From Swiss-Prot:
Keyword field contains Secreted: yes
Pfam families named in the record: CRF
Task of the protein: Regulation of fluid secretion. Stimulates primary urine secretion by Malpighian tubules and causes a dose-dependent stimulation of cAMP levels in the tubules.
Matches recorded under PROSITE patterns: CRF (PS00511)
Name of the molecule in the record: Diuretic hormone
Keyword Mitochondrion applies: no
Record lineage: Eukaryota, Metazoa, Ecdysozoa, Arthropoda, Hexapoda
Keywords: Amidation, Hormone, Secreted
GO cellular component, one term: extracellular region
Superkingdom assignment: Eukaryota
Coiled-coil segments: none
Subcellular location: Secreted
Source species: Periplaneta americana (American cockroach)
Family per similarity comment: Belongs to the sauvagine/corticotropin-releasing factor/urotensin I family.
GO function terms (MF aspect): hormone activity
Length: 46
């Protein structure tokens, strides 16, 4: 049971890090999708 407290301290940090990485990945996906959309619009006007 000695590892219980340390686990409860470490886990939230891992969860926070995971959420941060997911958020960064989502933002990158959104940016790339916006870029693709912008490129399509540019190609259509040419």
């Amino acid at each position: 049971t000695g590892s219980g407290p340390s686990l409860s301290i470490v886990n939230p940090l891992d969860v926070l890090r995971q959420r941060l990485l997911l958020e960064i990945a989502r933002r990158r996906m959104r940016q790339s999708q916006d870029q693709i959309q912008a490129n399509r619009e540019i190609l259509q006007t040419i």
